[in-house]
Curated annotation (Swiss-Prot):
This is Protein UL24 homolog. The lineage of its organism: Viruses, Duplodnaviria, Heunggongvirae, Peploviricota, Herviviricetes. GO terms for cellular component: host cell Golgi apparatus; host cell nucleolus; virion component. Belongs to the herpesviridae UL24 family. The keyword Transit peptide does not apply. It comes from Varicella-zoster virus (strain Oka vaccine) (HHV-3). The keyword Chaperone does not apply. It is found in: Virion; Host cytoplasm; Host nucleus, Host nucleolus; Host Golgi apparatus. Induction: Expressed late in the infection cycle.
Length: 258
């Protein structure tokens, strides 16, 4: 395979990883916003470190924009969360620059170091651009740049680097509206038909696992009867549910990791 094809393949894999991460992050934010206590994914705990779980649940406004076109820079994600804590308002604007890693065993490689330096430059430029484009106003906004390394397989967070926050003042509502208007990617909304299809698929997988477990049980009974006929007294071994458990764990992993 030529070098150009390898680069094109790596680009496609990275792009696919980005869109998957966007979908998962938006889903997790939406679940927390709806008040599902168990939906606070550990992925959010790392990303939203300046805020607490309660802060996110009590958010009065959450705005998420992906692939935001700011001219010279296009940050992967800009998330604005406005909360009310003990009567005092708090607004945090997260700028997420995502770097996908095909091989996640070692985070300290020349390639990842190059990605790190590039990401830092992108974040600094993005902070300056957001400060320039923020409409005039009295709202206090804490801009928090985040450089996130994520594995292409599993979407596991490998490293999150947070630059020092920068406080700016402006019109929060107009800023959020502007960022949404210049966003170039919107996570797809699954239709009711698609959700039902996924639900049926999960039920089908579970039924196959149960049939496999029953088959193992019947095989164990047959083996016991053969041993008994030969005069061999062996205890009946219960069928292993490892296959069923593995499938269920895989399903859980699909929903927890996107």
């Amino acid at each position: 395979m030529s070098a150009s094809r390898i680069r094109a393949k790596c680009f496609r894999l990275g792009q696919r990883c980005h869109t998957r991460f966007y979908d998962v992050l938006k889903k997790d934010i939406d679940n927390v916003r709806r008040g599902f206590a168990d939906a606070f994914n550990p992925r959010l705990a790392k990303l939203l470190s300046p805020l607490s779980h309660v802060d996110v649940q009590r958010a009065v406004r959450i705005s998420m924009s992906f692939e935001v076109n700011l001219g010279r820079r296009r940050p992967d994600c800009v998330c604005i969360i406005q909360t009310e804590s003990s009567g005092a308002g708090k607004t945090v604007c997260f700028i997420v620059e995502l770097k996908s890693c095909r091989f996640s065993a070692n985070i300290h490689t020349p390639t990842k170091y190059h990605q790190f330096c590039e990401g830092m430059r992108q974040l600094r430029d993005t902070v300056a651009l957001i400060k320039e484009t923020t409409p005039t106003g009295s709202d206090e906004i804490m801009v928090t740049p985040l450089l996130v390394f994520v594995s292409q397989r599993g979407l596991n967070l490998l490293q999150v680097t947070r630059l020092p926050p920068k406080v700016i003042h402006g019109n929060l509502v107009m800023l959020a509206s502007h960022l949404e208007n210049v966003a170039e990617y919107t996570p797809p909304i699954r239709s009711v038909r698609e959700r039902r299809r996924l639900c049926k698929k999960k039920i089908h997988v579970c039924s196959l696992a149960k049939k496999r477990a029953k088959s193992c049980h019947r095989s164990a009974l047959t083996k016991f009867e053969e041993n008994a006929a030969c005069g061999v007294d062996l205890p009946l071994r219960r069928p292993s549910l490892g296959a069923c458990g593995g499938i269920l764990q895989s399903i859980t992993g699909m929903f927890s990791h996107g």
